[in-house]
Curated annotation (Swiss-Prot):
Pathway: Membrane lipid metabolism; glycerophospholipid metabolism. GO terms for molecular function: glycerol-3-phosphate dehydrogenase [NAD(P)+] activity; NAD binding. It comes from the Bacteria. NADPH binds at residues 15, 35, 107, 139, 254, 273, 275. The active site is at 190 (proton acceptor). This is Glycerol-3-phosphate dehydrogenase [NAD(P)+]. The keyword NAD applies. PANTHER family: GLYCEROL-3-PHOSPHATE DEHYDROGENASE (PTHR11728), GLYCEROL-3-PHOSPHATE DEHYDROGENASE [NAD(+)] 2, CHLOROPLASTIC (PTHR11728:SF1). Disulfide bonds: none annotated. It is found in: Cytoplasm. Its main location: cytoplasm. Sn-glycerol 3-phosphate binds at residues 107, 135, 137, 190, 243, 253-255. Keywords: Cytoplasm, Lipid biosynthesis, Lipid metabolism, NAD, NADP, Nucleotide-binding, Oxidoreductase, Phospholipid biosynthesis, Phospholipid metabolism. It comes from Bradyrhizobium sp. (strain BTAi1 / ATCC BAA-1182).
Length: 326
């Protein structure tokens, strides 16, 4: 198994730049790819990404708009939003050496196909080896070198362990796993549940309500994960419970911020949609196909679709039939 000395990061946003810093701290030679040549040139000359201000780029990070140059790396991190993953992978796929690990660093489910991130990679780049990195991590914390732990999953345990060795450092601790689907479900479900948490905060329903919502939401995440064969230790680990706790903690999460605006009756934050807005209806359909009850996720999907008011959704959740806790 290769030591993955060279690592490319496709996507020069805040999260991509933070992961480039992670790889550099781990002693790897890093290529950070930006599709926009002007953006790449600015980062390269300023040695700072305006999307991650105050964080100087390490000397080991080269910045380029040349995708072929990035594709020569031993492993490639794909750091683009979930709904843009297929396009990014299709562009880089013809340039990759056979078997190159492609690590998805997005959390979500592809709209329209209902495919998880590693499934998208497998379809768009059959020559590559899919993997997934997920867990409780905000870009600015990671870029600053604050202690962070995540999960990195691949079907082959030796590959997952080698990727962990390539990225791990005293400030960034990945745990390896072969439970790819469990990791993906945790990342996708928590986006939707974070919108619900934001709504609770925006409505000023109190800390007790937020705790109840987070706990019952986690029960939904676990039910869906188990229906897809996920392992309990994955769902209760960093990529499941850990990420849910972080994302429900405050407006630094784009999904929580979207829910907060909804709860306050304000327009949704300008710019890109929160990933949970795409994922909510897909998550509900996946749950229905497996006979899994996800009332909180259903409520979020209905609110986003304009099918129910927030107050009516809250009332419906509170008036569900009483039952034993599970």
């Amino acid at each position: 198994m290769t030591c993955f000395q060279t690592i490319a990061v496709i996507g020069a946003g805040a999260w991509g730049t933070a992961l480039a810093a992670v790889a550099a701290r781990a002693g790897r030679d890093v290529t950070l790819y930006a599709r926009d040549a002007d953006h790449a040139s600015h980062i390269a000359s300023a040695r700072e990404n305006p999307r991650l201000p105050g964080i100087p780029l390490a000397s080991r990070i080269a910045v380029t708009a040349d995708l072929a140059r990035a594709a020569r790396a031993d492993t490639v991190l794909i750091v683009v939003p979930a709904q843009h993953l297929r396009g990014a992978v299709m562009h880089v796929a013809p340039l990759l050496a056979p078997g190159t690990p492609l690590v998805a660093c997005a959390k979500g489910i592809e709209h329209g196909t209902h495919k998880f991130m590693t499934e998208v990679i497998a379809e768009a780049a059959p020559c590559a080896t899919p993997a997934i990195l997920s867990g409780p991590s905000f870009a600015h914390d990671v870029a600053r070198g604050l202690p962070t732990a995540v999960t990195l999953a691949a079907p082959d345990e030796a590959l997952a362990a080698a990727l962990v060795q390539a990225l791990g450092s005293p400030t960034f601790r990945p745990y390896h796993s072969t439970d790819v689907r469990g990791v993906e479900i945790g990342g996708a479900a928590k986006n939707v549940l974070a919108i619900a948490a934001g709504i609770v905060a925006g409505r000023q329903l109190g800390a007790s309500a937020l705790a109840a919502l987070t706990t019952r939401g986690f029960a939904e995440l676990v039910r869906l994960g188990r229906a897809h064969g996920a392992r309990s230790e994955t769902l209760t680990g960093l990529s499941g419970l850990g990420d849910l706790i972080l994302t429900c903690a405050g407006p630094q999460s784009r999904n929580f911020a979207a829910g907060l605006a909804l709860g306050r009756g304000e327009p949704l934050p300008a710019g890109k949609l929160a990933e949970g807005q795409y994922t909510a209806p897909v998550l509900v359909e996946l749950a229905a196909a497996r006979g899994v009850e996800m009332p909180v996720a259903q409520a979020v999907a209905a609110i986003l679709a304009g099918a129910v008011t927030i107050d009516a959704a809250i009332e419906a959740l509170m008036l569900r039939p009483f039952k034993a806790e599970e």
